[in-house]
Amino acid sequence: VLFHGYQGSAETMLMIGYLFNHDFGFNVLIPDLRGHGQSEPSAISMGWTERTEVVDWIRTADSLFGGNTQIVLYGVSMGAATTMIAAAEESLPACVRCAVEDCGYTSTRDIFADSWEKQCRLPLFPLFHLSDLWCRILYGWSFAKASPLDAVHRCRLPMLFIHGDKDSVVPVEMVHRLYEAKIGDKELWILSGVDHGAAYLHDPQIYAQRVRTFVEHWFECPAILEQ
């Protein structure tokens, strides 16, 4: 089950979908997250509310593909953040064997603060804090709540972390924090000279080999979540 990034859609994931389907032999489900693509207009929560929808999509995939499936979660950017948060949910179905996150961020607060300082060149206080308060009042979630960093502290699912060391959107230091915080089985792959979301295009063959090796290893361990 594959998840796109902010302002993306299922269509923007077709190359990765082709990789998993044609090259790896997987059935693939690529949904439009809330407020994106053909989904109904809705407030985007950078992974927090979306996490429950991920669980629903997993159950849908399990049903569509026979009810006795093994599932890998894959996400890019906001989709990666959503994947990490969902992977720590207690309601995550046991059919999920592993997850791959590509260029996800530590928390909505961190990525918004970093972008704010880069683009606005204004102090965080008070406008940033007022924006956070507005989200709390209007939508019921805060920037700090949507936190993959907190989620991976609780996540037992094997996870592959992918990031470019020249990422201009999500600083590479964030993936190091995520990797260090992740409990259980994990792998970290830093690509030299690669910008945000460009890891696959940088070298499709190496990318495919690395992802496939990780995923197939955990598909050989069907009882990983029961350990």
Predicted feature locations:
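Hydrolase active-site cap/lid region
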Residues: 85-144, 150
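Short beta-strand/loop motif that positions the catalytic acidic residue
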Residues: 154-156, 161-163, 167
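Catalytic histidine neighborhood in serine/cysteine hydrolases
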Residues: 179-198, 204
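Short alpha-helix in the alpha/beta-hydrolase fold that links the catalytic acid
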Residues: 16, 148, 157, 171-180
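The serine-hydrolase catalytic nucleophile loop
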Residues: 6-20
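Catalytic active-site module of serine/aspartate enzymes centered on a nucleophile-bearing elbow/loop
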Residues: 201-227
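Conserved alpha/beta-hydrolase
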Residues: 17-40
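Alpha/beta-hydrolase active-site loop
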Residues: 44-65
